[in-house]
């Protein structure tokens, strides 16, 4: 293995400092408590303990240096437009609803996403990606793109205006518009975009690398369209798969 995919942001926490947006460290990096056990265990139980923290810049640089010495490329993942609740807890004005929001305490898909009709969203993300690009020397940045529910967009005046102004057909094409704009940002910083296979929906960004996780079909479709592909289907390579008959041996999640 010669690549380390470092998932640094999620609904449940933001794990790297961004100088221009300090609340990503002071607010988004923390959640009030954590789910105990498995997501499917109902009713949910929580530990009641505030949890959080983030990697200091020097720690990130140490990881990059350690990896480089061993010929390993580090690819950071900064999630968008979904899996963004932690970021939106600090900057709620970038959501469609305006908040308030809290960093999530359970796993899964959550309804709050970056507002695709708000120009401030793209300005915010461009500044973040500029900092990330200066820290990570590798050629790729992973932007997530997975599990983005469209309900907020369907109800948002700004997002619906964006769909109309850009002659888009629906919210799937709005996500494609979002990803394509982010790809242009990354190209300015000499980075290639990687996204989970949901970025195929609504139209694929021209130079995107597709990370296929929901089986093989998305990767095959992208490869047939001439795109580079990373295959990591859940059926074969997820560590949380149950390999024994004892459910207690399964990893939490």
Model-based region annotation:
Residues 1-189:
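Substrate-binding cleft of carbohydrate-active enzyme catalytic domains
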Residues 83-85, 142-148, 198-205, 236-239:
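A glycine-rich phosphate-binding loop feature that marks nucleotide/adenosyl-phosphate handling sites
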